[in-house]
């Protein structure tokens, strides 16, 4: 028979819009609630918890109960398809199904399905799996996230200023590669300590307690936060924006003009009654309550954060050279006078390593090629055996023998230094005459000395070639010694042509000499770096030389395998490929630094370079005020001129000219103490006259506390005692230049320091030095800037002191038009220098990456470079030419030119008189003589020609004297 089936479904009606909706359950609560059976019937996503199907009696329309169903056998389980169709029917139209009499819905509280004890025919239970809560993603730190991106090769996101500030304020500091606190941490701690100290001095204990309470209140979230020292970065950023819009250089308002920060309230906080307090006097107010008296010039911004980065130091094994060996001079077998002279005049009793290796070989007459580090005594290594061999010759040499030893050096200062050393060495031997020839001196006096005779001649290549072509008494026939000192610098300065011409002239004169018993010519070449061009020069000048390397390890072990060089013998070295002909680095890879030299570099933002240099010098002067010598290397002549004038006027107030002397009394800063009081600045570069260069060089050696601003003209061979610091304000273009620059200090076993200035974009130059086995440490810029704070009464922080000093530089530049022009020229010359780095360093020193506006600020300029660069970028005028630049170098053609010029000389010679008589004879009879009275114009009877008849010679200076013309010459009485 057909039985009616009753389906009891428990549903949960959906909430309507007008009804109040129940709050949504969390994932965790929903997971707990899924243990009970619930039927949620939503239109969007129905969730079936339980379906119970029961059989009931057919005729009655009463609500079925469990008792009306007889307890029979187990009901058969319906098919899955029938259950699915029932569910789909219910979900499609639940209201239609509810109106059916056969199916009735009992909405009751949720209960778990229980099997009927009365025995139902069948029962269908459909359940769903409980909802499992999703696991939250594990949180990772920012460093792990960036590291994961870096491993996957994804681009790193750029941090905002708020993120950087939050990272700096957080307690989790990144680990330093050197396991040392970062400069930024030390700087912030120092600023916090200074703030507390200032507050303690100004307000006493009560104010300090109230300030601490306010700090605690701010930390808990009430009120506005107090201004912290780290906010100076944001203040300076705002000032940089003001400066870019053309309003830089203006002073910021004092604290009375600023709004009271403690009065600011949070949005939900009630406004407290304003407390009135007694105002201090005006003088007290300006001294104690002025919080930010900073000239807003925009020095500290995002680049300052970049400068705080620690680059770290790699493990580098430097090339070591032993300077002193412990052997005495008496062991060389020299003349007793020479040994005593060295002890008395030079205080030298012990030999250096290069001297011990070189002097015995030179005494045996061998050609040598010497490579040794700067300051190891190379000059004495060839000068001492040179004098010893000359004084041994019998019969004694005489002055009239001429030049027996020729020493070629690259610079005039090195000529003076070498000449003074040889003068001391030949003091016991009065018959040996040394002399020097260098550019800038009078040729006439040099010709006279050459005619008298010079036995040991020291000179620069240009002046030596000049006398070789134009001085008949300069003969090199009897030359016995040819020495080339600082050979690599000779080639860098463009003297290769002159050196080659000198060597060819020596060989030609010796070949043409009739005396067949000429002494053998001994040749020596010395350098601190062995470049490929030095090898080529050695091939031209040396004959079977002996290579002497002073490094502790063999130079062949340091050769680069990829270049294919094997330097087992000097012959293989000279037959090297021309592949590195223009490569100026040391091909042996041996770049040795003295062990007592402490190398460091400082990463300085471009806008802080001038201030950082001033603070560095101030710190060193404070450490040793009575005895301090330093050399600051710069790239161009214009930079040296500008920084010399700027630092003198701004930091020492030294009178430079008459106008400064007149304005000295009108200055408003007479009460202030200069930052570098007592320090003297010198400048030295190649464009100065010889008289100026000699005076500067001697003044720098004799001065106790001074700084020399110079180009690379003093980078080679200059030996000035007691130089404590070398600053490379602009980076060198080659590693060899770096080695020679830092070699001006820590000479002959003394101690010294060298500091290299780099910008954040140039920091990878350190890795380039480390590849060359040069160990260098990173210095702290803020350690130098802190020196400015005690010397600035208006500044409260280091940033304020640095900004005030920069403002002082800019104000001085605005008031002095001449100094402003020098600054513009210096900046343009620096731009040209920066674009000429070699190919291998172009990625590090890239002119396209450099921010020219920031670099212009290091020259105290406020204008954009585009406004003045075109004006000062015009090509320079041609330098004054000498006889080597515009005359013929062939001696025969030179003599022909001299004979042609005699016709136009002011000396009254026979040719001139014949020319005058011919011109007078060619004049028409009766015609008046032309005005002017010039030679060759047919004016034989003019006053000028009559004056020539009385004088045998006239100098051109007599015509340019500016004196009034003399009266007409008196006529002679006729007999």
Curated annotation (Swiss-Prot):
It catalyses: ATP + H2O = ADP + phosphate + H(+). The keyword RNA-binding applies. Residues 242-261 have a biased composition (Acidic residues). The modification Phosphoserine is found at residues 75, 99, 210, 220, 224, 667. It holds the Pfam family CTE_SPB4. It is an enzyme of class 3 (hydrolase). PROSITE patterns: DEAD_ATP_HELICASE, HELICASE_ATP_BIND_1, HELICASE_CTER, Q_MOTIF. GO terms for cellular component: nucleus. SUPFAM superfamilies: P-loop containing nucleoside triphosphate hydrolases. Keywords: ATP-binding, Helicase, Hydrolase, Nucleotide-binding, Phosphoprotein, RNA-binding. GO terms for biological process: ribosome biogenesis. It comes from the Eukaryota. Residues 359-548 form the Helicase ATP-binding domain. Residues 1-38, 50-104, 127-295, 915-942, 955-975 are annotated as: Disordered. Residues 190-203, 269-285 have a biased composition (Basic and acidic residues). A motif (Q motif) lies at residues 327-356. Residues 64-94 have a biased composition (Low complexity). ATP binds at residues 372-379. Residues 616-789 form the Helicase C-terminal domain. Residues 1-24 have a biased composition (Polar residues). Probable ATP-dependent RNA helicase. Belongs to the DEAD box helicase family. DDX31/DBP7 subfamily. This is Probable ATP-dependent RNA helicase CG8611. It comes from Drosophila melanogaster. The lineage of its organism: Eukaryota, Metazoa, Ecdysozoa, Arthropoda, Hexapoda.
């Amino acid at each position: 028979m057909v039985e009616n089936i009753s389906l009891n479904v428990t549903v949960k009606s959906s909430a309507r819009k007008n009804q109040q909706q129940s709050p949504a359950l969390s994932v965790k609560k929903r997971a707990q609630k899924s243990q009970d059976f619930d039927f949620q019937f939503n239109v969007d996503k129905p969730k079936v918890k339980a379906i119970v199907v029961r059989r009931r009696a057919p005729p009655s329309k009463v609500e079925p109960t469990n008792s009306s169903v007889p307890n029979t056998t187990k009901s058969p389980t319906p098919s899955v398809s029938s259950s699915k169709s029932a569910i789909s029917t219910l979900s499609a139209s639940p209201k239609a199904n509810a109106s059916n009499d056969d199916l009735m819905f009992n909405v009751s509280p949720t209960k778990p399905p229980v099997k009927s004890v009365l025995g139902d025919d069948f029962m269908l239970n459909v359940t769903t799996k409980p909802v499992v809560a999703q696991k939250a993603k594990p949180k990772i730190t920012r460093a792990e996230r960036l590291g994961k991106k870096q491993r996957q090769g994804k681009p790193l996101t750029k941090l905002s200023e708020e993120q950087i500030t939050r990272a700096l304020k957080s307690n989790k500091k990144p680990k330093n590669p050197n396991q040392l606190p970062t400069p930024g941490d030390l700087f912030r701690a120092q600023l916090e300590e200074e703030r507390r100290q200032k507050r303690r001095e100004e307000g006493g204990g009560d104010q300090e307690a109230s300030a601490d309470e306010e700090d605690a209140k701010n930390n808990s979230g009430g009120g506005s936060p107090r201004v912290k020292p780290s906010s100076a970065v944001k203040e300076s950023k705002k000032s940089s924006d003001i400066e870019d819009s053309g309003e830089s250089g203006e002073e910021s308002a004092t604290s009375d003009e600023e709004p009271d920060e403690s009065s600011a309230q949070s949005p939900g906080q009630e406004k407290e009654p304003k407390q009135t307090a007694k105002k201090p006097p005006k003088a007290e107010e300006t001294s104690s309550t002025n919080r930010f008296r900073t000239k807003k010039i925009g020095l500290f911004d995002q680049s300052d954060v970049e400068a705080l980065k620690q680059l770290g130091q790699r493990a580098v094994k430097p090339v070591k050279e032993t300077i002193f060996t412990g052997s005495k001079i008496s062991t060389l077998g020299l003349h007793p006078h020479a040994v005593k002279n060295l002890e008395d005049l030079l205080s030298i009793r012990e030999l250096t390593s290069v001297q011990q290796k070189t002097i015995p070989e030179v005494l045996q007459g061998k050609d040598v090629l010497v490579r040794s580090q700067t300051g190891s005594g190379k000059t004495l290594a060839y000068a001492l055996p040179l004098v010893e061999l000359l004084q041994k010759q019998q019969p004694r040499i005489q002055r009239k023998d001429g030049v027996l030893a020729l020493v070629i050096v690259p610079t005039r200062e090195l000529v003076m230094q070498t000449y003074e050393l040889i003068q001391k060495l030949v003091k016991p031997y009065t018959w040996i005459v040394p002399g020097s020839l260098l550019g800038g001196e009078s040729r006439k006096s040099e010709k006279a000395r050459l005619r008298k005779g010079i036995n040991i001649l020291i000179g620069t290549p240009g002046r030596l070639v000049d006398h070789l072509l134009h001085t008949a008494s300069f003969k090199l026939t009897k030359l016995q010694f040819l020495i080339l000192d600082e050979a690599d610098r000779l080639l860098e300065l463009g003297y290769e042509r002159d050196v080659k011409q000198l060597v060819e002239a020596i060989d030609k004169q010796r070949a043409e000499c009739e005396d067949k018993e000429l002494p053998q010519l001994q040749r020596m070449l010395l350098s601190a770096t062995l470049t490929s061009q030095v090898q080529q020069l050695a091939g031209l000048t040396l004959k079977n030389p002996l290579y002497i390397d002073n490094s502790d390890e063999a130079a062949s072990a340091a050769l680069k395998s990829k270049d294919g060089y094997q330097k087992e013998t000097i012959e293989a070295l000279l037959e090297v490929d021309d592949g590195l002909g223009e490569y100026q680095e040391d091909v042996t890879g041996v770049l040795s630094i003295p062990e007592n030299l402490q190398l460091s570099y400082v990463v300085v933002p471009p806008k802080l370079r001038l201030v950082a240099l001033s603070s560095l010098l101030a710190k060193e002067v404070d450490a040793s005020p009575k005895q301090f010598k330093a050399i600051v290397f710069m790239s161009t002549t214009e930079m040296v001129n500008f920084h010399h004038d700027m630092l003198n006027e701004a930091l020492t107030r030294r009178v430079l000219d008459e106008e400064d002397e007149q304005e000295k009394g009108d200055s408003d800063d007479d009460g202030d103490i200069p930052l570098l009081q007592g320090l003297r600045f010198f400048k030295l570069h190649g464009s100065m006259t010889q008289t100026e260069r000699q005076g500067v060089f001697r003044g720098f050696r004799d001065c106790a506390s001074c700084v020399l601003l110079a180009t690379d003209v003093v980078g080679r061979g200059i030996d000035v005692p007691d130089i404590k610091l070398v600053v490379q304000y602009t980076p060198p273009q080659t590693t060899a230049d770096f080695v020679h620059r830092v070699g001006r200090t820590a000479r002959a076993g003394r101690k010294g320091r060298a500091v290299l200035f780099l910008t954040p974009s140039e920091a990878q130059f350190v890795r380039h030095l480390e590849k060359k086995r040069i160990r260098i440490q990173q210095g702290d810029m803020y350690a130098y800037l802190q020196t400015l704070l005690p010397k600035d009464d208006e500044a409260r922080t280091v940033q304020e002191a640095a900004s005030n000093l920069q403002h002082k530089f800019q104000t001085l530049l605005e008031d002095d038009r001449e100094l402003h022009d020098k600054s513009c020229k210096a900046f343009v010359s620096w731009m040209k220098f920066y674009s000429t780095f070699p190919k291998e360093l172009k990625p590090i020193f890239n002119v396209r990456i450099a921010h020219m506006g920031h670099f212009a600020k290091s020259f105290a300029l406020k204008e954009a470079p585009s406004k003045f660069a075109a004006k000062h970028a015009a090509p320079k005028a041609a330098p004054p030419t000498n006889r080597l630049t515009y005359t013929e170098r062939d001696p025969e053609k030179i003599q022909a030119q001299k004979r042609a010029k005699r016709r136009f000389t002011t000396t009254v010679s026979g040719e001139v008189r014949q020319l005058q008589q011919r011109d007078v004879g060619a004049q028409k009879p009766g015609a008046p003589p032309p005005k002017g009275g010039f030679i060759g114009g047919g004016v034989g009877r003019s006053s000028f020609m009559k004056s020539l008849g009385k004088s045998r010679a006239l100098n051109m200076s007599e015509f340019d004297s500016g004196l009034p013309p003399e009266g007409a010459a008196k006529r002679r009485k006729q007999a």
